[in-house]
Structure formats: structure tokens, C-alpha cells
Amino acid sequence: MKKKVMAALSAVVLAFSASACIGNVSAADKTVQTVENTAKEEVSYSLSNQDASKEAEELYGYICETFGNAIISGQQESTWMGSDQYEFDYIYKKTGKYPAIRGLDYMNDDFKGVNERAADWHKRGGIVTICWHCGCDFSGSWDECMKTELDDWDKALTEGTPEYKKLIAGMDKAAEALKELKKQNIPVLWRPFHELDGGWFWWSKGGAENFKKLWIIMYDRYTNHHKLDNLIWVFGYSGNNRDYDKWYPGDEYIDIIGADSYSDGANEKLYRSVEKIADGKMPICFHECGRIPTVKQLKEGKADWVWFMTWHTEYITDGNNVDDLKNIYNDEYVITLDELPNFTKTK
């Protein structure tokens, strides 16, 4: 059974204040002015983990209230450009603003470094999202995502087999890292097995049925065995498929649904496709993009993505017009780091 979070959405202006609540979830300290709401006036959303932490509830509640009223800015980091602040310094230099969400990656077994940067971003008041590029042994880099493949999906997904034990041992690497963030009361938008339907990463090469089993195994392992109550589960489609329903494991394993695309514009057709799967039960995010859609494009396309996250390095520095970037980050519809509620306040 899912934990209920109510989001009562206003028609024109959504005010987040210390006294405002979403169900039993405190919304925020800072008032944020947003524009016309295209969502329903009252929507019931649910957290999949019945025992989710207070911090996860608060973050999820904020995202639910934002959905349909504004878009949260996000940026994926790189760590090989001379500074782990490369993209963030660039955005601030060009716009005077920082993104609200920092995207991180446990790739190359960088659990310690990612956790340190996640904790720092959280202390700055930001939102943390983590993905995991890895091979089928849950180690390595982006290349291993593409080049490796499970030898026998049936054995790997059958409890008690040596292959299953190996799968679980690999999966547990990130669980241990996420426990360290849990100890610090840091909620995480956890985005595993992204671009799940694309066919290029090992986790999608076994087909939809095997993928769904894999997702459920991780969800159960992390939620029920490791008691990771700080995770908000983000289910991320690619933009290259329209047969989305067959990959969907069920509402009880997902908190936020989304897709990515490196095509210009609001990608409203992609949004509509994902919206059908969401069926009004959860927010929808643009979990990766190249060129950020303008606010005009989002409004005209009625694409109510709750956040965007630009990919790293040249995707932000070369792929986005500086004037557009400045306009986007300074538009009242776009939430930046300085406009987030105080998620780090003493509970």
C-alpha cells in the first residue's frame, strides 16, 4: 500500500509557506510565485514506501505541489573538467542563478565522492538526484552499461541461484552508499536503470518482462531489506520508444515517472505518452535533456514537466544559447536553488 500525499493546487498562484501542508507534510518556508496552473485543482499522489522518512515526505510533497505550477531547474554534474562545480559555476556566471537539483552518478564506484558532493549540495539547500551507470556486475563506467550483458536472465532473477546472489551483491554496493545519505537525513531522487526501454544499456537487453523483475528486486531489496526510507523512486523512460506500458512494473514501485530527450523544444508528444502511463497518479519529470525548453515552449505545448535536468559538459555550455539560458533561469516559472524551501532546517 502506498503512503498518501495530498496536493491541493491553486489556480494561479501557489504559495509555499511554513504553515502550508501537503497532507501531513510541511511544504516550505519561502513563498514562490508561479504562473497559470494546468493541473487539476486537487490531486492525490502517493509515496510508494509506506515508511518513508519525514525528509522524503517533505521533498515529495514539495514536488507534488510544484507539478503543474512551475518547473524545477536541474543540472547533471561532471567530475573531469578540472572542477566538480564546472557546470554549476558556468550557469551561475551566465545567469546569476544556480540550479535547484544536482544530478550525480555512482559510475566508476564513486560512492564516497558522490556522497560528499550530495551532502554538500544538500547543505546548500539543494535537491539531490542520483543515477548509476554501471556494468551488469554493478561496477565500471558508461562503457560497461553498453558492453556487458547478463548471461542468463532466468538464473540471475531466480532467488537462491549463484547468479542471483551475484546480482544482489552488486546491487548492494549502492545500497550501502545510500545508507550513508540516510544517516545524514538526505532524501534522494533515486533514478536507477534509466532509459530503461532504450535497448542500449544491459538492463533493457533482456526485454520488458525481465526488466520489470529486475526493478522490483531492487525496489524490494532497498526498501524492505535495507530500509532505505530516504529514497524517492524515479522511473525514467528514454525518448526513443512509444510502447511504454509493457515496461511499467506497477504504481507500487514508483514515485515519479519521466522520460528524457535530446531533441529541442518542450517534447510535448513525449510528455503526453508518459502522462498516459502516469494516469494522474504521480508527477512527471524531464529527467535528462540537452537544450532546455523555453518557458514559452513549455506553456504552448502544455508540457508540465516538474523538473528538467540538463546533461553535463558541452550539453550545457555549447548546447544552450546564453540568452535563452539567462531568460530560463530568471523566469518566475523556473525554480532555482535560491527559491527552494529550507529542506535542511532543524526538524
Positions of PLM-derived features:
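Sec-dependent N-terminal signal peptides of Gram-positive bacterial secreted proteins and lipoproteins
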Residues: K2-N24
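Substrate-binding cleft of secreted/luminal carbohydrate-active enzymes
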Residues: F67-S78, M282-K347
